[in-house]
UniProtKB/Swiss-Prot annotation:
Stated family: Belongs to the glycosyl hydrolase 1 family.
Natural source organism: Lacticaseibacillus rhamnosus
EC number: 3.2.1.85
Protein name: 6-phospho-beta-galactosidase
Pfam families: Glyco_hydro_1
GO cellular component: a single term: cytosol
Record key words, sorted: Glycosidase, Hydrolase
Reaction catalysed by this enzyme: a 6-phospho-beta-D-galactoside + H2O = D-galactose 6-phosphate + an alcohol
Lineage, broadest ranks: Bacteria, Bacillati, Bacillota, Bacilli, Lactobacillales
InterPro entries for the chain: 6P-beta-galactosidase (IPR005928), Glyco_hydro_1 (IPR001360), Glyco_hydro_1_AS (IPR018120), Glycoside_hydrolase_SF (IPR017853)
Length: 474
């Protein structure tokens, strides 16, 4: 049976400033935590990325032509405040006004993120999410944006806070590349929730006629077997990556079970509990009651089994299938059951995980009025065919199959009562990846990075049909 999406369900593509704009040294842009980190690695450069800084109109025209109603963008904090605070860079401000005007011209509603993995370098150097000064400057940057860009009606405070907190201090794949510091991870998680809450409360106090939400990376953890030990490992993994954020941002308080699981992880690693104050918890509670929507970024699921050895993370950054390792002392070891399909980067293809996460939010966090799927997609190794013309359409049947399965899971969740209002595919066009460079392509539109020419993929045509008909083809 063909699956239907609601008539008011919106579809679009997602981007992030650092991954698409390029122009990292143009028009007074300040440095961010990635610049030094990537230069020292010498593996790949964020310039020119997809050169969106100069080619945004071309990409927005493609989005419009292929049936999109919405688009996810982010503002690069260091284009507005090169140092994170203090002097404003007017050229950066002017760029975003032009970008948002182009969205209006192309009939695209922008959902704009304030922080998408790109802390200004000075604030990263003093502790990033562990620094109170950073948290204060973040709120002031948000205030500036709310006042400066009244044309934006859909704001997102932070993109995937869990990806930053865990990968900065536990797995070490994001700068400052520390490993095993669960105490720093949980303190960063709490501090992110506090900063988010203060920004939501600020936005609502300003009486602006728009919506504000947050975007979480939510990959569903399952037990590897039906043993109680494996179930507990899945619960601990859930506490590390999901539970604190869901409780804090969507319920306004940390559940006793969440805190007990976190204390267990920290005790196993002989690390102290994170600190929080009554004032912070009051702000968190107030914000949860005012939040307009939550964004769910879901790509894959995880399976956990009990593990009591040393922590070890091996990141598969080049698509060498089967090379990733993830085992954390005090939590568990990731191991996929037989028969689970994966990408070359070892990400499982398991749409049931999307359904279960959407239903979990619907059932366990009734305060939040709306859900958007703010990222979902598949990274593939893709190249241009030999005889390419400007009209070449690139076949990507694996992506179409993936999108069909995951959109069907979204439709099932809506049918079961979840108020999912829209879907953003990651990504609009091929982009620069933080830890994979240019080899992992997610776009609906192929970017030939040496020439910056765009080519349509068949998935763009497929999604256009879904957008126009609100029917997922069989």
């Amino acid at each position: 049976m063909r699956k239907q999406l609601p008539k008011d369900f919106v579809i679009g593509g997602a981007t992030a400033a650092y991954q698409v704009e390029g122009a990292t040294k143009e028009d007074g842009k300040g440095r961010v935590l990635w610049d030094d980190f990537l230069e020292k690695q010498g593996r790949f450069s964020p310039d020119p990325a997809a050169d969106f800084y100069h080619r945004y109109d071309e990409d927005l025209a493609l989005a419009e032509a292929y049936g999109h109603q919405v688009i996810r963008l982010s503002i690069a904090w260091s284009r507005i405040f090169p140092d994170g605070a203090g002097a404003v860079e007017p050229r950066g401000v002017a760029f975003y006004h032009r970008l948002f005007a182009a969205c209006a011209k192309h009939h695209l509603i922008p959902f704009v993120t304030l922080h998408h993995f790109d802390t200004p370098e000075r604030l990263h150097a003093i502790g990033d999410w562990l620094s109170q000064e950073m948290l204060e400057d973040f709120v002031e940057y948000a205030r500036f944006c709310f006042e400066e860009f009244p044309e934006i009606k859909h704001w997102i405070t932070i993109n995937e806070p869990t990806s930053m907190a865990v990968q900065q201090y536990t797995s070490g794949t994001f700068p400052p590349a520390e490993t095993g510091h669960f105490d720093k991870t949980f303190q960063a998680e709490h501090n992110q929730i506090v900063a988010h809450a203060r920004i939501v409360n600020l936005y609502k106090s300003m009486g602006l006629d728009g919506e504000i939400g947050i975007v979480h990376a939510l990959q569903t953890p399952y037990p590897y077997s039906d043993s109680s030990e494996d179930q507990h490992a899945a619960d601990l993994q859930d506490a590390l990556e999901n539970r604190l954020y869901l409780d804090g941002t969507l319920a306004g308080d940390y559940a006793p079970k969440t805190l007990a699981l976190i204390k267990e992880i920290l005790a196993a690693n002989q690390q102290p509990m994170f600190k929080y104050t009554d004032e912070e918890m009051a702000a968190i509670k107030k914000a949860a009651h005012q939040l307009d929507f939550v964004g769910v970024n879901n790509y894959f699921s995880k399976w956990l089994r009990a593990y009591h050895g040393k922590s070890e993370t091996i990141h598969n950054g080049d698509g060498s299938k089967g090379s990733s390792v993830a085992r954390l002392h005090g939590i568990g070891e990731e191991k996929k059951p037989a028969g689970i399909e994966t990408t070359d980067w070892d990400w499982s293809i398991y749409p049931r995980g999307m359904y279960d996460m959407l239903m979990r939010i619907h059932q366990d966090y009734p305060l939040v009025p709306a859900i958007y799927v703010t990222e979902n997609g598949i990274g593939l190794k893709e190249s241009l065919p030999a005889e390419v013309t400007p009209n070449t359409v690139i076949a990507d049947p694996k992506r179409i199959d993936y999108l069909k399965k995951y959109l069907s899971a979204v439709a099932d969740a809506i049918q079961a009562g979840a108020n999912v209002k829209g879907y953003f595919v990651w990504s609009l066009q091929d982009q620069f990846s933080w830890t994979n460079g240019y080899s992992k392509r997610y776009g609906l539109f192929f970017v030939d990075f040496p020439t910056q020419k765009r080519y349509v993929k068949q998935s763009a045509e497929w999604l256009k049909q879904v957008s126009q008909t609100h029917v997922i083809p069989e």
